[in-house]
């Protein structure tokens, strides 16, 4: 079954088309200019199993034909567990290499926050551009989102989430993309620097790129939301 529908963003030049096909959720992020319309991001959220691998491969090929600039796979954390000692892992790994980025063990909330991150690179004030998402095919990413009305609490939440996620990791990340998302609240440079400093244990020097977007409709005007994409070495 295919379900489709558009949603508007805060800016007329960016739209998100939602598609659902047999339980596979897809978000298509379009960039519109005066003379052209481009499919910049395609995010595919699915529960991996041996039966649907062919369907996912077909979708990726279809979006390549549509000239999608960046295809991101989000694997549902609630899906069937993968046996790493089995040939299934080889098939899974082969599928992941077909995406530009893939986020393993993703929740539906992670998927929605990642869609918001991608649209913010089009509607906010970014230093992140589309080419920053382009690395070696199959690059694994890790995703963290936290929000609070207090900078100190936000720093603590981000630090704790990162410590938990990267508890068995010693190497720092070479590239991190950060979105600061608010609804009318404009972060000061000092506040941004404080939030960057909370990441010192996890990122290399000068590895950060960021986007500021203070037009997140529906968000509490006092709340600051921070989403981070940590990229493995490509």
Where are these regions (language model features)?
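Tubulin/FtsZ superfamily GTPase core signature
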Residues: 1-234
């Amino acid at each position: 079954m295919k379900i489709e529908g558009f949603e508007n963003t805060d800016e007329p030049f960016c739209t998100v088309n939602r598609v659902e096909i047999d339980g596979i959720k897809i978000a298509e992020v379009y960039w519109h200019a005066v003379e052209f319309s481009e499919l910049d991001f395609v995010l595919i959220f699915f529960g991996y199993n041996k039966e649907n691998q062919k369907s996912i491969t077909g979708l990726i090929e279809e979006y390549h034909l549509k000239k999608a600039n960046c295809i991101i796979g989000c694997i549902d954390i609630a899906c069937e567990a993968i046996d790493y000692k089995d040939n299934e892992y080889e098939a899974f790994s082969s599928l992941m290499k077909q995406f530009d980025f893939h986020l393993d063990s993703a929740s539906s909330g992670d998927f929605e926050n990642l869609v918001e991150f991608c649209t913010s690179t089009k509607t906010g004030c970014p230093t992140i551009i589309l080419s920053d998402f382009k690395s070696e095919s199959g690059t694994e990413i890790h995703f963290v989102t936290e929000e609070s009305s207090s900078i100190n609490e936000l720093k603590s939440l981000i630090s704790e989430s990162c410590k938990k996620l990267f508890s068995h990791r010693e190497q720092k990340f070479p590239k991190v993309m950060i979105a600061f998302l608010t609804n009318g609240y404009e972060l000061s440079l000092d506040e941004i620097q404080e939030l960057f400093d909370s990441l010192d244990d996890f990122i290399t020097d000068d590895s950060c790129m960021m986007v500021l977007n203070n037009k997140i409709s529906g968000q509490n005007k006092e709340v600051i939301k921070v989403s981070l994409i940590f990229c493995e070495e490509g």
